[in-house]
Amino acid sequence: MNIASAYLKQVLDLQDFESWSSTRKHYLPSAYHRLFTEIDKHCEKFHRLPTIEDLKFEIRDTTTKDLIFAIDAIDVEAEPFMLLQYLKNEYTQKEILNSLEDYVDNSISFEDAEESVNHLHQIVLDIEDKVELQEPQESMQRIPLFEPD
């Protein structure tokens, strides 16, 4: 079992739309991108998260269908929000390491001090753009449509 499988299992079982709305495709391993797209399409079409059973019927791709059956078979007790944080942390760490590796390989010996500092700042800004570091202030799900009597 991996974190992505556990996360998707919990989100779908608990119908946790709040966690799902904070999920980005790039937080998940590439093997899960097709499944992410299918779940997202279902949400846009029906305005709700699919169940695992819905996905078993809707998806025809064998690889993705096998992934759904594997996700369905696991037993998870962790909260979706916590699992999402783990996914974001893992993604962020990989991005930082990849960016620093690229920086060391291509720039470090050719830049002066100011250029090096600016390059490192740019790496931080790029990663901040890719990862939501703060929780959204308001969710449309929490805004009441009508005022209480």
Where are these regions (language model features)?
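Terminal low-complexity, poorly structured segments
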Residues: P80-L83, Q93, S116-H121, D129
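A charged, amphipathic interaction segment
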Residues: M82-A113
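Charge-rich, solvent-exposed alpha-helical interaction surfaces
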Residues: E38, H42, E58, A70, ...
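Intrinsically disordered or highly flexible coil/loop and linker segments, enriched in small
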Residues: D16-F17, K45-R48, Q93-I96, S109, ...
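Short, flexible coil/linker elements and helix-boundary hinge sites characteristic
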Residues: H47, K56, I71-I74, E101, ...
